[in-house]
Regions:
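Short active-site neighborhood of thiol/selenol oxidoreductases, capturing the structured segment around
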Residues: 38-55, 77
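A short beta-strand-turn-helix
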Residues: 23-42, 71
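Non-globular targeting/processing and membrane-anchoring segments
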Residues: 20-24, 36, 118, 129, ...
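Thiol-based oxidoreductase modules, predominantly thioredoxin-like and allied folds used
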Residues: 22-25, 64-105
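A short, hydrophobic beta-strand/beta-hairpin element that forms part of a small beta-sheet core
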Residues: 77, 113, 121-138
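Detector for the c-type heme attachment site
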Residues: 55-59, 128
Length: 180
């Protein structure tokens, strides 16, 4: 028992040191499994291989030390290729990409999970509750400063109080970001 406690303490002490190494991406299946052990919201980066803004989001935003630290602490981060072949079991259904064409250059067919989530542009960041239910997709490239409000609003459940456009506007006006 003491050995397990010591291991957990060491992991907690050492893990912030690795935050600078990058976001600890996982698959959607891994994130959903992790939620059963330790519930946490999921942040899904939906991208395609040909998407220029997706590459910028990866480099500039998900490479930012403040974003890395916050995402690793508050979310299970998922990387999901919207035109890939990964099989994902979500809410009792297994999603695939049956029309994927091996060796095709550029665009390919959309994965059925991306279709089910109504993803229409890339990149899209999709947020899920601790139980796996969809919260909200956020479409388009976001800088660290632009994504901060979404990361914190959703992690802190503030989005539950924002039921009108006016409430969202007031929230934005009062939000004081700290990401650089």
């Amino acid at each position: 028992m003491k050995k397990k406690v010591l291991i957990v303490i060491l992991i907690l002490l050492i893990s912030p040191l690795y935050a600078q190494d990058g976001i600890r991406w996982m698959s959607m299946n891994e994130a959903l499994e992790a939620q059963t052990e330790a519930p946490k919201k999921i942040l899904m980066d939906v991208y395609t291989s040909w998407c220029g803004p997706c590459k910028l989001l990866d480099k500039n935003t998900f490479g930012n030390k403040d974003v890395i630290k916050y995402v690793n602490k508050n979310y299970y981060p998922v990387k999901f290729n919207a035109e890939g072949t990964e099989s994902v079991t979500y809410q009792d259904f297994t999603y695939t990409n049956p029309n994927y064409q091996e060796g095709r250059k550029g665009r390919n067919s959309q994965h059925l999970l991306a279709h089910a989530l109504k993803i229409t542009g890339y990149p899209t960041i999709v947020f899920f509750k601790e139980n796996g239910d969809l919260i909200q997709p956020v479409v388009g490239y976001k800088t660290p400063e632009q994504i901060e409000i979404f990361l914190k609003m959703i992690a802190n459940d503030d989005y539950l109080k924002l039921t009108t456009g006016e409430a969202w506007q007031e929230y934005q006006n009062n939000f004081k970001g700290s990401f650089k």
